[in-house]
A protein has these predicted regions:
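Bacterial N-terminal signal peptides that target proteins for export
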Residues: 1-10
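Bacterial N-terminal signal peptides
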Residues: 11-21
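Bacterial lipoprotein signal-peptidase II cleavage site
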Residues: 21-32
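Short, glycine-/small- and polar/acidic-enriched structural segments
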Residues: 35-177, 194, 200, 212-219
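Short, solvent-exposed loop/beta-turn-alpha elements that line the ligand-binding surface or hinge
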Residues: 65-71, 222-234, 300-309
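Pocket-lining segment of extracytoplasmic ligand-binding domains
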Residues: 101-102, 110, 183-279
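Secondary-structure end/capping motifs
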Residues: 248-322
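Conserved C-terminal helix/tail region of periplasmic/extracytoplasmic solute-binding proteins
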Residues: 313-340
Length: 340
């Protein structure tokens, strides 16, 4: 499993701002709680997650809570980052799974009132091709990439990877920005050897429409290759889990219990793809058939503590250097990173 839980001090949180694979326009709710026999004093927790890879790791925890006799904790799935932001800032939810840069934006907006608990999703961006001409980043020179997410994290991540490989975006590589992933797919299917940057699970959806579409570059792996010799390597991060700082301070045991349950849920999802995919479909995140193929490529993880801080702060620094507004105008302070 891609779980790295920090206990004590060792290596042991939906933007975009945008979550690259947000799906649907309806909100789904599921309520759950611990049975009264477990403890009468347990604090109910209200959790909100953005639909897509950022919420996929929660599905086992959601299912377990639904099966309890006396539901009290509440899980919601939202279609848009703005909905998550508003409810978190207004105190309507306690914990939320959001795009990584949105967490920093919320931290700045609330004057430090939000903390990140864990990284829950690494990169989900892929270079795909209707052909077989791209084997490395260098092969993108002189080519056109169809992509969506201009002025948001997909653009900044792509620019970073191109530049670190000696390519100048807009000069060595043409990037044709589209408003939606579906437009990228249409362009991809209309040309021979066309190239696009797409997120999971949309990559999987695209491949169901054309068996000619193949993944050529995993941008998470390309980011890691750039960082491999760094003294403090960052990672390409899609989603994190955050909580209101006041809730953390007032309910440390509830937060700790949530973290334990979430870590176990991520474990289950990565180890039991078929069962997890059925749950993803049940909660209408994406269809089960899509989830079954997409989960292994969604980089669902659970990284906390010092490793989380190093990976996330480095990622936010890359965004900040290209556009400070992408992280809320300023890099978050040390108090942004939760530590048990």
């Amino acid at each position: 499993m891609k779980k790295k839980r920090k206990m004590g001090f060792a290596a042991a949180i939906l933007a975009m701002v945008l979550l690259f694979a947000g799906c649907g326009q309806t909100e789904t709710k599921t309520e759950s709680s611990t049975a009264a026999s477990e403890t009468e004093d347990e604090t109910p927790v209200h959790v909100l997650a953005l639909k897509g890879p950022t919420s996929m790791g929660m599905v086992k925890m959601m299912s377990d809570n639904d099966s309890k006799e006396s539901p009290a904790d509440t899980f919601e799935l939202a279609a848009a980052p703005d909905e998550v932001s508003a409810k978190l800032v207004q105190g309507e939810v306690d914990i939320a799974a959001v795009p990584a840069n949105l967490a920093s934006v919320l931290y700045n907006k609330t004057n430090g009132g939000v903390q990140v608990l864990a990284v829950n999703t690494l990169g989900v961006l892929y270079i795909v091709e209707d052909g077989d001409t791209v084997q490395s980043v260098a092969d993108l020179k002189g080519r056109t990439i169809y992509a969506s997410g201009k002025g948001a994290t997909p653009e900044y991540a792509l620019n970073y990877i191109l530049e670190k490989n000696g390519l100048v975006p807009g000069e060595d590589v043409t990037i044709e920005w589209k408003s939606e992933h579906a437009e990228c797919l249409a362009a991809l299917m209309a040309e021979d050897n066309a190239i696009a940057m797409l997120p999971q699970p949309f990559v999987t959806t695209a491949q169901t429409k054309s068996d000619k579409i193949q993944v050529r570059l995993d941008l998470t792996a390309e980011w890691n290759a750039i960082q491999k010799d760094s003294d403090a390597p960052s990672q390409l991060i899609t989603g994190v889990v955050v909580a209101r700082k006041a809730f953390i301070e007032e309910n440390p045991e509830a937060v700790s219990a949530f973290m334990d349950s979430y870590a176990a849920s991520v474990d289950f999802v990565n180890a039991n793809i078929d069962e997890a995919a059925e749950l993803v479909g049940k909660y209408e995140i994406v269809p089960a058939a899509v989830a079954q193929k997409a989960i292994p490529a969604c980089n669902i993880t659970f990284i906390v503590g010092g490793e989380m801080k190093q990976a996330l702060s480095g990622y936010l620094s890359v965004l900040f250097e290209q556009n400070p507004k992408a992280v809320g105008g300023a890099m978050p302070g040390d108090d942004f990173y939760y530590a048990e």
